[in-house]
Structure formats: C-alpha cells, structure tokens
Amino acid sequence: MSWNTFGRVLRMTTWGESHGPAIGCVLDGCPPGIALSESDIQPFLDARRPGQNKFTTQRKEPDQVRILSGVFDGQDGVQRTTGTPISLMIENVDQRSKDYSEVAKAYRPGHADYAYDAKYGFRDYRGGGRSSARETAMRVAAGAVARLIIPDVTITGYVREIGGDAIDAARFDSDAIGENPFWCPDADAAKRWETLVDEARKAGSSLGAVVECVAEGVPAGWGAPIYAKLDGDLGGAMMSINAVKGVEIGDGFDAARLSGEQNADPMRPAAEGSDAGPRFEANHAGGISGGISTGQPVTCKVAFKPTSSILTPVETIDTEGNATEIRTKGRHDPCVGIRGTPVVEAMMALVLADHMLLHRAQCGQ
C-alpha cells in the first residue's frame, strides 16, 4: 500500500495497523540540535489517548511513545535531534479482534471496508486495519516534534459544534477548552453535549462534529504560489484525517455569501516604530492570501462525519454481494471529532513546520 508519507521537507511516514503489535512513524527532515525527549511528545498523546471517559472509545491504550532513532545526548547532557530520521513507536496493548468477525464478512456503510477491497482485493478487517483512526496517534506524535521546530507559533484546536449544536461565540473562553472532555470553549455547550453524546452512545449511534484550529505567531511569507499554497496544503492535510469530509480556511463557504467590501480584510499602517507589519481590521482570509501567510492567525474549520462503526443495524452487502445487515460491535467513539481535535492541531503543526523549512530554504530566513 502506497501513499503513507506526508510533507515536502519535513516528511512523516506512518506505519502499522489498529490491531497489529505496534504503530509508528519516521519523521525525516527535522533540523539538528533541537532538544527532544519522550516527555516532549507524551502530553499530546495523552490528550488524544482513548478510554479516558464515556464520551470516547473504551479501548484502553496507554500510548507510551518510544524514540528509537534520530536523537543523541549532547555535551550538555541534553538529548537533541541529530538531523537523521526520527523513528517513533507505540505498542498496541488492548486489541479485541474477535469483535470484528462480522466485519470480515460484510462491509460497514460509510467505512473504508468496501473501498479497500475494491482497490486491493484484500484487507485487514480487525478494527479497520490501516484505515483505523489508531493511525492518527502517530500524527500527534510527529506533530509534537513539529511544534518544536516552530516554537514561536501557538496552535489551539477546539470543538465548535457537535451534532448540529454549536457553541455561542459570545461565551468563548479559551481557558475552558481543557476543562471539559469535549475541547469546548463554551461551558454551557459542553454541558449540553454531555447529554447529547451520551444519548447517542446509549442508542448505539454516533454524531458528527466541527473542529476549529487557530495558529498564532505565524509570520508573513510562509507558503508559495500556485501548487504549494499554504491553504492548499492545509486543506489536504486535514482531509487526510479519518472521517473528515470538509475543510474551510478562514470564512470558507461563508465568504461566498459576502460582498467584496464585506469580505475584505482592511489594512492599516503599522504602529509607529513597529516592525510587525501592517495592521488588519479583519481576518476573513484565515491568515492566508495567494497561498502565502499574511502574519495574521491562520485559521481553519474541519468537519468530521459521524463514526461509521455503530451498533444500530444498517443495510449493507456481504463480501459475496448479497444483501444483509450489519451491527458493528467493537469499541468506537460516539463522536470521533472529539479526539480528532489533537489530530487537527498536529496536522496544522506539520504543515506549518514544513512550510517554514521550505521558506528558509528558498528565502534564507
């Protein structure tokens, strides 16, 4: 199976399956001399880790990362990157493959089962194999390294909508994001979602979500025209995440409903004595114009579909083409967008770090 590598200069290759012995990634292109240990990566994996509450899958994975290569202790006793490929690995410890006996014989509508069979003629049905969101743990690990390459950039993801119930922007509180299991900046919405997601879980169903991600501290100039646009790469990165069906940069589709003057981001001269660049009065563009960052926050919204693996019976066909029904047992997220939030952050970090290195290679700064 090909197409397991992401990035141009900073290249991440992930490997492994949901119910295999381990998952891992190789991150190539990381500059040398960056202090890096497992403790720099683990907190981000802990944020994504399954089984922490009833609103996510009950699969219990400690997700303890090991750095296998690409680092060495310097003379100061600090472990640093060497510039060679960084290999990361996480062991799988809580697989229950017997839960997927029905999936071996029938396709889950909305899942990758049929598409994988149609393309390859063979698939690992245990937990979805390579198509499982288990793979995204390695994106989060690689994203943690990418953040160290761009230390002046702050990346924040949060859930803005679950099952059609959106946050109230007037109640936005960034401090609330880490205080509830939904990455929600609106405490009232988080309370409502407790009931909403729990009801879906008990009914054997699932819900979709919208995740927003904001990167602050991105300087003007990252990105490139035409075929290496920053927003183009962001869109592709987010669409590569399991269950993602839509991405908006800045105002996205709302921009199509505005007039030219409404959609403009008016510019004002920089404050006297400042070298911070012009001041913008709005950010409809999401911090990117012409495929290149403007110095404003880079923003995107990511739409996650409802989890396809549900206990509710759904009409389908078996591998012989006969009509049947399927109920997916196993352990699955009632709303995959919740744990998708750290993954969105990680992909933002990987894209931005890659473009920083591209910019430095071409422009020398």
Curated annotation (Swiss-Prot):
Family annotation (InterPro entries): Chorismate_synth, Chorismate_synth_AroC_sf, Chorismate_synthase_CS
UniProt keyword Protein biosynthesis present: no
PROSITE patterns in UniProt: CHORISMATE_SYNTHASE_1, CHORISMATE_SYNTHASE_2, CHORISMATE_SYNTHASE_3
GO molecular function: chorismate synthase activity; FMN binding
Pathway(s): Metabolic intermediate biosynthesis; chorismate biosynthesis; chorismate from D-erythrose 4-phosphate and phosphoenolpyruvate: step 7/7
Free-text remark on how the cofactor is bound: Reduced FMN (FMNH(2)).
Short name of one Pfam family: Chorismate_synt
Binding of NADP(+), residues: R48
PANTHER family the UniProt entry points to: CHORISMATE SYNTHASE
Protein family: Belongs to the chorismate synthase family.
Subunit relationships: Homotetramer.
Protein name: Chorismate synthase
Species this protein is from: Erythrobacter litoralis (strain HTCC2594)
